[in-house]
A protein has these predicted regions:
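Structural core segment of the AMP-binding/adenylate-forming
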Residues: 11, 52, 79-144
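Proline-centered helix-kink/hinge sites
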Residues: 20, 68, 86, 145-147
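Conserved AMP-binding/adenylate-forming core of the ANL superfamily
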Residues: 4, 13, 21-67, 71-75, ...
Length: 147
């Protein structure tokens, strides 16, 4: 059997077209999501990243423990051709500063539990901090979800 070579966005879109009503995620805290729900959320977050000025090749960091929104964020970043920079949750502020600056990260998605780690972290590139728990920006708390 020959497998097609697909990008992450193509893989998700194909899965959605074949299995749109099937369950894709099921977590106690966030409930159930079908492939169509997942795809819609990925496209919504991807569109908001574009609205924030993120372009193909820009770096977007993810600082969070495992959660459904981590995967949604990864797919959204890939969907617009940006580069995901996953950051280990155990890093301290100094390490975060170095990683974000060296990678020239433009946007970071951070979990509420780890947001304090970013206090004092400033780089000439970082423009937006977004809470991954509910996809709101930490500076204005404008919700990114189209609910």
């Amino acid at each position: 059997m020959t497998l097609k070579k697909l990008t992450l966005p193509e893989l998700l879109k194909n899965s959605c077209s074949k299995f749109s009503k099937n369950l894709s995620l099921n977590f106690v805290a966030s409930g159930k999501k079908t492939y169509q729900d997942l795809y819609n959320e990925v496209v919504s977050i991807a569109n908001h990243l574009l609205h924030l000025g993120v372009k193909k090749g820009d770096k977007v960091a993810i600082l969070s423990a495992n959660m459904p929104n981590w995967g949604i964020t990864q797919f959204a970043i890939a969907n617009i051709g940006a580069i995901a920079v996953p950051v280990l949750p155990g890093f301290c502020s100094t390490e975060l500063q170095n990683i974000l600056e060296h990678a020239e990260v433009k946007v970071i998605f951070v979990s509420r539990l780890l947001a304090k780690c970013l206090e004092g972290v400033k780089t000439p590139f970082l423009e937006h901090k977004i809470l991954i728990n509910n996809f709101s920006t930490t500076d204005s708390y404008t919700h990114l979800r189209a609910h």
